[in-house]
Amino acid sequence: MQTETSQGPLTGPEGDGPVPTGGPQWRALLEMRWRARLQEVTGLALAYHEAEAAAGRGGGEDRLQVQRLLRLQRRTVTSRRALADTEEALARLSAGRYGWCESCAAAIPARRLAATPETRYCARCARGRGR
């Protein structure tokens, strides 16, 4: 089964082999994910600051306000990490290293990259790292 985008199938030369270095479909996918993640991080940061300001206006921070701030903070940290992962994947693509396992240097199958475009490891090495 091949995954497709508007630019065509997300496959390597053999359908599930290594990714063509600098493949435009991979760049388009990663850039789309980067924009979505940047928008998410921006929205979460704004929501956090608004919630923080509202908590300050209330005179005293009640438990629900503190819990909301903590939830927003955790989501923001997670989203920033995902944004950084996408930026790193774009850097690997530009450097010609995208689609190659950082641990064993094996080609990462296109099917795995289609499922998790930011992955740095083949399935075997990811299992060994507990990912």
Describe each PLM feature range:
Residues 1-95:
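Interaction interfaces in information-processing and related assembly proteins
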Residues 36, 108, 120:
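Short alpha-helical
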Residues 94-97, 118-121:
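Short metal-coordination and nucleic-acid-contact micro-motifs, chiefly zinc-binding Cys/His arrays
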Residues 95-99, 105, 109:
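Alpha-helical hinge/cap motifs
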Residues 101-104, 122-125:
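Short cysteine-rich clusters marking metal-coordination/redox-active sites
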Residues 108-109, 127-130:
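Short functional micro-motifs and their immediate structural scaffolds
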Residues 111-116:
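Short Cys/His-rich "knuckle" micro-motifs
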Residues 117, 126:
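A short beta-strand motif that forms part of the nucleic acid-binding face
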